[in-house]
Design a protein with these regions (language model features):
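Nucleotide/phosphate-binding catalytic cleft detector across ATP-hydrolyzing
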Residues: 1-159, 176-191, 203, 211-305
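Conserved blade-register residue in beta-propeller folds
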Residues: 21, 169-171
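Ser/Thr-glycine-rich phosphate-binding loops at phosphate-binding pockets of nucleotides
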Residues: 162-168
Length: 305
């Protein structure tokens, strides 16, 4: 969070797997209850309905403005970021983003969606929040994550933002984003998750917990027997190979350019990929894109005076 003229600039990265702010990460799973849930933890109360947030992930949808739950998740993310600084009431300028190839067509609809209520009262984890929305800045996903690294960029570079639902691809030449050379592929980490769970079911006839698969994808191992680990690792290697195959479809050549990877898919490339580590940079900070949104919005608003 940043502050400018008594307005809190809060960035929210609306992922399919996780909602990220500059300082928080929360899985996107959300479930509604008519009465307050018995157990505590990540409970949003809005318009008389209770929502438990953080168990599981949302499915891919091509237009987030058509899903009311992303508005609720936005309120949750803002509350979590404000809570880091013990703030309960604020004038808020939102900074968010959309996939590279979708932002032109969806920008204004998504902005209206996020700003649908100029003033909002709600409770999160038992604490009252009162927000006044002052505005919203929207940016292409992925690119903001590397803004602070642009000083290291020379010649041709390729950015791959691998999230839970999509992979966004963008060429950056001489530190400038090439808007005519950007693509979005539905090849997010969830595709690997589904394939791994199905492979275990097909081979061993058992269902495996998603959290176990997630641990393997993130860290390369888990406390399970070797045959199961080998099965999931094989699927992960196939998925990473498909990622690189897709990048080559868009003329990726490691001899001629450097590759920068952001998003949750970076850990899969590190754990299961075969690549030249001197030519590929994996940015591990899952909040990097949100931090980039925040920086860009702050600079833009400051220039306006």
């Amino acid at each position: 969070m940043r502050e400018l003229r008594n307005t809190k600039i809060i960035a929210v990265d609306h992922g399919y797997g996780n909602m990220k702010t500059a300082n928080t990460v929360t899985p996107t799973g959300i479930k509604a209850y008519e009465t307050e849930p018995i157990s505590t933890g990540n409970i949003l109360e809005y318009n008389g309905i209770y929502y438990r947030i953080g168990e599981g992930h949302k499915e891919f949808i091509p237009d987030k403005a058509m899903d009311e739950e992303y508005y609720l998740l936005t309120l949750m993310a803002i509350a979590r970021e404000l809570n880091v600084f013990s703030i309960r009431e604020a004038d808020v300028h939102l900074a968010a983003g959309l996939p590279l190839t979708w932002i032109r067509n969806q920008r204004e609809a998504f902005r209206s969606y996020l700003l649908q209520n100029p003033e909002v009262h709600y409770r999160f984890n038992g604490k009252e929040y009162h927000l006044h929305f002052a505005g919203c800045s929207l940016y292409p996903q992925g690119y903001p994550a590397i803004v602070n690294h642009l000083g290291n960029f020379k010649g041709t570079n390729l950015l791959a933002d691998i999230g839970n639902g999509t992979m966004n691809i963008l060429y950056i030449n001489n530190k400038k984003a090439q808007e005519s050379r950007c693509w979005t592929e539905k090849l997010g980490v969830n595709q690997c998750m589904i394939a791994a769970k199905n492979a275990v079911l097909d081979k061993f006839g058992v269902k495996i917990e998603e959290s176990t698969v997630e641990q393997i994808l993130r860290f390369g191992t888990a406390d399970i027997s070797a045959p199961y680990l080998d099965c999931i690792s094989s699927i992960a290697r196939q998925y990473v190979a498909e990622l690189f195959s897709t990048l080559r479809k868009y003329e990726y050549n490691p001899d001629l350019m450097r590759l920068y990877v952001v998003g949750g898919g970076g850990c899969l490339i590190r754990n299961f990929g075969t690549y030249d580590k001197s030519r590929v940079t994996i940015i591990d900070d899952i909040c990097a894109t949100a931090k980039g949104y925040e920086s860009l919005a702050y600079m833009s608003l400051k220039r306006r005076g």
